[in-house]
């Protein structure tokens, strides 16, 4: 499908503003950013013992807003850099930048504006450490991963996953002004979760990545090798998911959830390795989302109920 010509985007003035808003909103990758903010919120909650005060709640809400703004800025910058790649892939061809609906200067200004506003919010209303860690995460994702690693190496997800694993650290820093070992455990869980999550997606989208010229693992090393890596990573992830219980960050409720979810993820990966199908790869990818969301939700419930 050819990108829509500029004239096709013209609408009556009454409809122009909502359409433009939806385009900018799409640039922020809302679903991804929602998961980022959720993981940051878990770090915030675990950093505060007992029932939070109103001041704690206020600080957490402000921190979530600042992190959302900077995460949205990173997503928009990613769309700007990868617009030609996105246009070649079915999964991303709908993005406004890929369709030529937003100019490069406008997209760059939008990304810079969100980043500046979010950084200001975090620096002034939260603390400088959180601002600098969040800005470093922006650079890690938008520049190191998107510009350098992704088009260069099949290990892009492994190395670049460090920026994606930062949200709980940001949340912890927001509430305490420091980075505790508990935050690093949450970082480790997301860091190890990221490769099998993305490689499951890459397995059934391999032709998209091949057409776009991206050296994702299934493109460079083949289907079978990637399936094995997905399975092995879920095995390494399993004990990491038990660490919050081992180090007394959580109780039995989280332990039960972590064991069941980890068995489920490893089970999906085992089936994927032994008997591949696109449908099973898609199912594994979707379960990985359930795994992380439910795991952190269990941490949240355990913190208040046990």
UniProtKB/Swiss-Prot annotation:
EC id: 2.5.1.141
Keyword annotations from UniProtKB, A to Z: Cell inner membrane, Cell membrane, Heme biosynthesis, Membrane, Transferase, Transmembrane, Transmembrane helix
Location in or out of the cell: Cell inner membrane
Coiled-coil segments: none
Keyword Cell inner membrane: yes
Keyword Methyltransferase annotated: no
Catalyzed chemical reaction(s): heme b + (2E,6E)-farnesyl diphosphate + H2O = Fe(II)-heme o + diphosphate
Pfam families in UniProt: UbiA
Highest rank taxon of the organism: Bacteria
Principal subcellular localization: membrane
Topology in the lipid bilayer: Multi-pass membrane protein
Entries under InterPro entries matching the protein: Protohaem_IX_farnesylTrfase, UbiA_prenyltransferase, UbiA_prenylTrfase_CS, UbiA_sf
BP GO annotations: heme O biosynthetic process
Listed Gene3D superfamilies: UbiA prenyltransferase (1.10.357.140)
Molecular functions per Gene Ontology: protoheme IX farnesyltransferase activity
Chain ranges passing through the membrane: 35-55, 61-81, 106-126, 129-149, 157-177, 183-203, 224-244, 245-265, 286-306
Annotated metabolic or biological route of this protein: Porphyrin-containing compound metabolism; heme O biosynthesis; heme O from protoheme: step 1/1
Function: Converts heme B (protoheme IX) to heme O by substitution of the vinyl group on carbon 2 of heme B porphyrin ring with a hydroxyethyl farnesyl side group.
Family that this chain belongs to: Belongs to the UbiA prenyltransferase family. Protoheme IX farnesyltransferase subfamily.
NCBIfam families: cyoE_ctaB, PRK04375.1-2
Further remark: Carbon 2 of the heme B porphyrin ring is defined according to the Fischer nomenclature.
Protein's UniProt name: Protoheme IX farnesyltransferase
């Amino acid at each position: 499908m050819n990108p829509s010509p500029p004239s096709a985007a013209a609408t009556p003035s009454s409809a122009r503003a909502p359409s433009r808003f939806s385009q900018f909103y799409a640039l922020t990758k809302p679903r991804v950013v929602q998961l980022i903010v959720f993981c940051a919120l878990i770090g915030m909650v675990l950093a505060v013992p007992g029932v939070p005060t109103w001041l704690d709640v206020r600080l957490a809400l402000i921190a979530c807003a600042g992190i959302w703004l900077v995460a949205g800025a990173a997503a928009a910058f990613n769309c700007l850099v990868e617009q030609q790649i996105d246009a070649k892939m079915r999964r991303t061809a709908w993005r406004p930048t890929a369709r030529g609906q937003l100019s490069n200067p406008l997209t760059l200004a939008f990304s810079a504006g969100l980043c500046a506003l979010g950084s200001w919010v975090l620096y002034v209303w939260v603390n400088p450490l959180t601002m600098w860690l969040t800005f470093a995460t922006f650079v890690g994702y938008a520049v190191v991963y998107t510009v350098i690693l992704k088009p260069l190496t099949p290990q892009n997800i492994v190395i670049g996953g460090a920026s994606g694993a930062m949200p709980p650290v940001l949340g912890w820093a927001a509430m305490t002004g420091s980075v505790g070992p508990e935050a690093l455990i949450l970082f480790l869980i997301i860091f190890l979760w990221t490769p099998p999550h993305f490689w499951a997606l890459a397995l059934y989208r391999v032709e998209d990545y091949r057409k776009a010229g991206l050296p994702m693992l299934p493109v460079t090393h083949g289907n079978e090798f990637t399936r094995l890596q997905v399975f092995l990573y879920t095995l390494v992830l399993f004990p990491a998911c038990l660490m919050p219980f081992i180090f007394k960050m959580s109780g039995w409720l989280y332990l039960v959830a972590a064991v069941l979810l980890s068995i489920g993820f490893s089970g999906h990966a085992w089936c994927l390795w032994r008997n591949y199908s696109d449908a099973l790869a898609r199912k594994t990818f979707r379960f990985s989302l359930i795994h992380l969301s439910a795991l952190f939700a269990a941490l949240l419930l355990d913190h208040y109920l046990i």
